[in-house]
From Swiss-Prot:
Catalytic site positions: C12
Family annotation (NCBIfam families): arsC (TIGR00014)
Keyword line: Arsenical resistance, Oxidoreductase
Protein name per Swiss-Prot or TrEMBL: Arsenate reductase
The enzyme's E.C. designation: 1.20.4.1
Reaction(s) catalysed (UniProt annotation): [glutaredoxin]-dithiol + arsenate + glutathione + H(+) = glutathionyl-S-S-[glutaredoxin] + arsenite + H2O
GO biological process, one term: response to arsenic-containing substance
Record organism: Neisseria meningitidis serogroup B (strain ATCC BAA-335 / MC58)
KW Isomerase (keyword) present: no
Pfam families, sorted: ArsC (PF03960)
Length: 117
């Protein structure tokens, strides 16, 4: 069975739903409570690349107050600056994110996860 990892926040309903989806399918995933054990910059870059996004904002909680407080809505910021911000402030990481089969998906909507399983 391929290694599957979920970046999870137990306080988030979407994250809990994603974990339930994996469990219902009998998939034993490594659960990373990213607020307790945040990914480092290298891991964030890997996730970003696996997501295949044009902008790191696609893996950020752009509606979070912290995002605006830190000035991350500045269009001149590059992906490296955005990923460093997530590394420094893991609460900015969108959740859930599932890594499987060399790919990643943000589970909003949950159907996105299906594409990587």
């Amino acid at each position: 069975m391929p290694e599957i990892k979920i970046f999870h926040n137990p306080r988030c309903s979407k994250s809990r739903a994603a974990l339930s989806l994996l469990e219902e399918r009998g998939i034993a995933a490594e659960v990373v409570k990213y607020l307790d054990t945040p990914p480092d910059l290298s891991e964030l870059k890997d996730i970003f690349n696996k997501l295949g996004l044009a902008s790191a904002r696609g893996m950020m909680r752009v509606k979070d107050d912290l995002y605006k407080e830190l000035g991350l809505d500045n269009p001149n910021l590059d992906n490296d600056a955005l990923l460093r911000a997530i590394a420094d402030h893991p609460a900015l990481l969108e959740r859930p994110i599932v890594l499987a089969n060399g790919k990643a998906a943000v589970g909003r909507p949950l159907e996105n996860i299906e594409a990587v399983l």
